[in-house]
Structures are given as structure tokens and as C-alpha cells.
């Protein structure tokens, strides 16, 4: 896809507004065969006013249905430190959905979780939830704040999941805070082609970017060891001015940059429309696309096949870290800065 009105003469410049339109509408709906025609026109998408999502409404209903005893276990002040935590395999409260909530409440939780995802992708998410942990009943839920009284957020956690529903309570923060998703398909140690892993398509798209790089660019983009997985610290953002390793997107050719747009589209594909658009706006808010750098990591290459299992996109306002060895872990944090 090309932006006919924003070429700088060298074919490198991609207009910021066009970037949002391309990825939010075309980058997910048109360049990804898994989800054709998912969105309306870009003008409608970007102009649409914020509306209370069904998941937010259900989260409020869930809160109001809690007994006093239940609230003591799963309801917290909005500024409680648990709300900002993220990890790859953890229980935000010591009680699980299946053992603690009534059948009606369990049904609401399932519907809230479904509503956080693209309806064209949610069955894949539930497939990995079932394979990884035996279903949503094994996960845990916490509620922060009170609906109707200001900021309010629903958080669901468990193996390979930290998901949030916040209704824009956290200004300038995509998804309501850092999130995690992942999948161990068929075994803990996946094969090089990651058979039936529902998120491996994202790495395949990222490797298309690497294949499009010239030799000099590859030397800059291909690094040794990736960041360590350390819970919330994994997605700590760099300060503006700190060095971000990898190949800056601003130094890529136009065709390469368009491939990065497709990567972003595929990364956002699993999520509901409101979160996709919010994430793109937050990425773009302070020079986002030009601020991104992309890196690949050779020291965690399953099968030594030079199809890079571990890679990331990073800027001062974003970390999207895909660690595909020994199976897929994906860490995400997108936050604008004042």
C-alpha cells in the first residue's frame, strides 16, 4: 500500500495519519489473509467517538454482582500495585474463575474476555487458553476501582495471559496497561516451524522484514541475546534519548517500512477494534513509527535455521517483544509520555 500524497522524493516518508489508517484498516484487514474485510472505511474508524464497549459494561455488571465476601478477595483500589503487574504465568488472586465465581459470573467473565478480542481471532485465543491451562476456569480475575466512580479496570491472568479491560481509564496507555499473550503448542519445546501455534504467524511476518534487509542493515538488526524475562521489568520503557538497539525504521526503505506496517497489523490482529485504534494512536503520538527500531536475536534460534524465533519492535513509547523459544511468549507495553 502506498501513500500517494506523502512521498519525500526518495520514497521513504510515510505520513503519520496514513500510517494509522493503513495499519488499523488495511494493515490488518487487507494484508492479513486471516481476516479480510474486518473494518469499515478508515474515515469512519478514526472519526468514531469513544463508546462504552460491551466488555466494560459486563465488567461493571460483574462487579455489582459480587457479594461482600467476594469483593474482599478480588476487588482492590484502582491504584493497587497488582493492577500494573504483568507476567507470563501468574494468578492475580489466589482464587480461580471456576472455583470462586457463580455460573452467571463465570459466563460474564468469559464474555468479557471474548469481547477484548477480534471476533475473527477469538476462537484461536480460546484454543490456546484451553491447550495451555485447560480453559478460562483455571485463570484468575481482579477488579480495580469501582464502576461509575471514576477509574475502573478488569484484569484476567493465568498461563500465557495477562489481559485487561479498562474503558480508557488509564489515559495514554494502550490496553489499559502492559499485557502478555503466548502459546505452547503441542509441547513446551516447540519445533522450528511452531506447528499449530496460534501466534507464530506474527513471527513469520517479522521474518519477511529481515529477508528484505540488505547485508549492512542485517548486521545492525541481528543481535545476540534478547532481553531477559523478568515480569513487569521485561516491558520497562527506555527513557527518551537512551539508545535503543536494532535497526531504526526511519533508516529503512519505503518497501521495508511498509513491511513493518504489516507486522504491526498482524500484531494487533487478535484484539478488538477499539484497542487496535488506541494502540496505534499511542504508538504514533510522539513520532512513533519513525521512533521504532526492529531487532532479531540469533542466540535463541530453534533449529539453527535463520528463521528468527525471537525479535522485537521498540521505541521510547513501546515494547512489543516476541520471544518464540522454546515456545511463544509475547510481552507488550505501549504508553505515551507527557
Give, region by region, the residue ranges found by the protein language model.
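N-terminal export leaders
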Residues: 15-31
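Generic alpha-helix initiation/capping and coil-helix boundary signal
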Residues: 17-20, 40, 48, 52
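N-terminal domain-start interaction segment
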Residues: 30-32, 36-37, 230, 234
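A cross-kingdom marker for long, charged
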Residues: 44-68, 73-213, 218-338
Amino acid at each position: 500500500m502506498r501513500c500517494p500524497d506523502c512521498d519525500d522524493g526518495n520514497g521513504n516518508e510515510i505520513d503519520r495519519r496514513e500510517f494509522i489508517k493503513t495499519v488499523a484498516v488495511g494493515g490488518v484487514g487487507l494484508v492479513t489473509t486471516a481476516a479480510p474485510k474486518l473494518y469499515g472505511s478508515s474515515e469512519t474508524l478514526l472519526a468514531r467517538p469513544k463508546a462504552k464497549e460491551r466488555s466494560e459494561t459486563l465488567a461493571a455488571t460483574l462487579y455489582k454482582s459480587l457479594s461482600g465476601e467476594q469483593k474482599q478477595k478480588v476487588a482492590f483500589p484502582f491504584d493497587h500495585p497488582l493492577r500494573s503487574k504483568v507476567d507470563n504465568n501468574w494468578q492475580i488472586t489466589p482464587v480461580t474463575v471456576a472455583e470462586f465465581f457463580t455460573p452467571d459470573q463465570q459466563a460474564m467473565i468469559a464474555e468479557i474476555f471474548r469481547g477484548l478480542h477480534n471476533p475473527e481471532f477469538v476462537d484461536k485465543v480460546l484454543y490456546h487458553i484451553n491447550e495451555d491451562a485447560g480453559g478460562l476456569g483455571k485463570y484468575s480475575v481482579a477488579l480495580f476501582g469501582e464502576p461509575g466512580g471514576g477509574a475502573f479496570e478488569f484484569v484476567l491472568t493465568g498461563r500465557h495471559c495477562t489481559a485487561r479491560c479498562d474503558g480508557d481509564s488509564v489515559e495514554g496507555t494502550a490496553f489499559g496497561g502492559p499485557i502478555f499473550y503466548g502459546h505452547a503448542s503441542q509441547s513446551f519445546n516447540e519445533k522450528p516451524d511452531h506447528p499449530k501455534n496460534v501466534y507464530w504467524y506474527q513471527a513469520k511476518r517479522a521474518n519477511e522484514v529481515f529477508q528484505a534487509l540488505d547485508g549492512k542493515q542485517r548486521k545492525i538488526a541481528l543481535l545476540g541475546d534478547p532481553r531477559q524475562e523478568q515480569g513487569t521489568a521485561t516491558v520497562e520503557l527506555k527513557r527518551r534519548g537512551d539508545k535503543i538497539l536494532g535497526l531504526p525504521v526511519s533508516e529503512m526503505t519505503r518497501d521495508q517500512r511498509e513491511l513493518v506496517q504489516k507486522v504491526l497489523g498482524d500484531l494487533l490482529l487478535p484484539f478488538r477494534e477499539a484497542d487496535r485504534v488506541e494502540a496505534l494512536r499511542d504508538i504514533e503520538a510522539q513520532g512513533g513509527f519513525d521512533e521504532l527500531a526492529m531487532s532479531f536475536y540469533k542466540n535463541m534460534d530453534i533449529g539453527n535455521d535463520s528463521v528468527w524465533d525471537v525479535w522485537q519492535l521498540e521505541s521510547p513509547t513501546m515494547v512489543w517483544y516476541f520471544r518464540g523459544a522454546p515456545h511463544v511468549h509475547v510481552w507488550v507495553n505501549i504508553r505515551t509520555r507527557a
